[in-house]
Amino acid sequence: FTIDEQLYETLANDQAFYLRAEPLRHPLIFYLGHTAVFYVNKLIVAKVIEERINPHYEALFSIGVDEMSWDDLNDDNYDWPSVAEVKAYRDQVRAMVDHVIETLPLALPIDWDNPFWAIMMGIEHSRIHLETSSVIIRRLPLDQVRPLPLWEICEESGVAPQNQLLSV
């Protein structure tokens, strides 16, 4: 949760969350909510929790896009909540996930029949979106982002190495 939120601190203002930097993706407000919703939805399916935190958000932020023409990217079809509301929701989800991690009996191995599998999926899913969201943020106009020490600019450059195919 923390590193996701630190990534979004690079946005200069709340309006940046609602810009569509990548035409085939939702605005960043979706991804801020999506990674938290993923935990809730997976923990419900795994029968680790029984009640949703915010059923409206858990529908709104559940399904992303696959860069296909039939994906719903019409902004008129979405009434995105405020950044503060989504952050408050994330805080609730984080408290619930922390409680699950602290109280759910851990049995090894963690495979897909293990309730902890949903937590592992949530962690992996968040890491994937950390990467994709960082790419979307890099496509924003420069006045919509700000530098932060955690996300230093890479000063290294050079010629790309020559790749070669290896026999397998």
Where are these regions (language model features)?
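Acidic/histidine-rich alpha-helical segments that form the ligand environment
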Residues: 63-108, 117-121
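Short, contiguous alpha-helical
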Residues: 9, 15-69, 106-166
